[in-house]
């Protein structure tokens, strides 16, 4: 029978000093011997996805105490990728993931906590906490802050839906007036919560459901809706149950590594492909799998991308649907249900509710259950009122969206495409692979051949696009922006948004060893591995080179003779791999990250061989 980890600091005379300090935090005599559960919050006023989380930790803590545990809250950092976008701040975003994972490990191990409830939401916070949970392997439940409501405004006598990406695109569009741009900006992000489309934050929160580590509705129930409160309360109650099963009954099945198995990672990736999620999720799943000691690689992603259809299209892949519409259609349990009926799911994986995934789908998939409480939950909708407060409204749709032919979520028979929403490409320029969100690519350019125009940084690319250097037919190559080369692997949302602003969204491709925001769409290919700073062929591309992209056949090639490439390699080796014409101040902290970082095909995690 496993002993409570916290007993290390709460039992025996030699721990009198530690107990004295525990008492100073408010613990009473009868608390010693109860499981100490870390409430890992990420409240910050910098991030709309986290601005409403201040009281959530204590909400969970109170429920833990009622259920028989001792709750102790601490906070992690949280970077807002949208605010950090387009300037040097973005260099810090991906490295913050690893800092979050480490900080959770430090706090939990230093204080010998027995379990965790992770209150996350935005882009790097959920992945960082996920890495920590799988590294520590103690009972853990995730509950996120929830999605933002979609923005709405009236233009040309029509009410249109908006999100952050619309503000970026229209802000740089020279054909849009200042008045309209300002109107869109003021309407795009109306409430607290993670940005309203299937961007990275919401994608990752959805994937925690598929992994079995969060409760049904975690990925889709709006931050503003009163129904979301119950997820926090249930997480507080259930984590104590998991502690009892593990520490009192020696039930190893409740541990994160027992839940997030190889089969569960396959399920998460299948969900990601089916819902056209962010390409960043690939990076984070690869990193999390390594923490879980699960053999999940780019080869698995390639395998799954060839068999899983695209069952849902949500912003930025369409403006018709946002996360509030996914919830109305039954949320993640509904998409998993469609995958299960198509024979594309490992339905015997386990969840933190103690159910198999098949049992959980049967209970929560609106296409299977007649439970009015479940249907009521998935009718929770937006109120359209600007607010930074959680649980501030209880608006409901009249009906759920159960149209699997033309609705937000489709069955396999009526899929948006039988090819999934994400694909891995490979070829001489990406020997270890690269990733494209196919759900966001126009069918007319699934095969593309164009001339390279090369930029050594995101900043140069932005200047080139807005300055008119990029023309229709170009393959925009942005290199030395990988985990090492950045360092930090910046997101390229501004270059892709500005291509649209300049009317080139369907006329160009973009290839980078950096990454993309979940808000990116178009023929945007990222995570090119190996990256330029690791000697990848992308570092040898010159202006005017031909690059061929063939998404249906999963190929990408630099069409340059081998002899010419060998000569370029020799010239590059002679001078060393260094991006030309780039002035970028890089802090010591970022240099440390870059020194240890692996390429994107390994999840940009630290290279353990260097330690």
Swiss-Prot record:
Family of this protein: Belongs to the IlvD/Edd family.
GO biological process, one term: isoleucine biosynthetic process
Lineage, highest ranks first: Bacteria, Pseudomonadati, Pseudomonadota, Gammaproteobacteria, Pasteurellales
Cofactor(s) listed: [2Fe-2S] cluster; Mg(2+)
Pathway the protein acts in: Amino-acid biosynthesis; L-isoleucine biosynthesis; L-isoleucine from 2-oxobutanoate: step 3/4; Amino-acid biosynthesis; L-valine biosynthesis; L-valine from pyruvate: step 3/4
Catalytic activity: (2R)-2,3-dihydroxy-3-methylbutanoate = 3-methyl-2-oxobutanoate + H2O; (2R,3R)-2,3-dihydroxy-3-methylpentanoate = (S)-3-methyl-2-oxopentanoate + H2O
GO molecular function, one term: dihydroxy-acid dehydratase activity
UniProt keywords, alphabetically: 2Fe-2S, Amino-acid biosynthesis, Branched-chain amino acid biosynthesis, Iron, Iron-sulfur, Lyase, Magnesium, Metal-binding
Cofactor: binding comment: Binds 1 [2Fe-2S] cluster per subunit. This cluster acts as a Lewis acid cofactor.
Gene coding for it: ilvD
Sites where the protein binds [2Fe-2S] cluster: 122, 195
HAMAP family: IlvD
Oligomer and partners: Homodimer.
UniProt-recorded name of the protein: Dihydroxy-acid dehydratase
Cited InterPro entries: Dihydro-acid_dehy_C, DihydroxyA_deHydtase, DiOHA_6PGluconate_deHydtase_CS, ILV_EDD_C, ILV_EDD_N, IlvD/EDD_N
GO cellular component, one term: cytosol
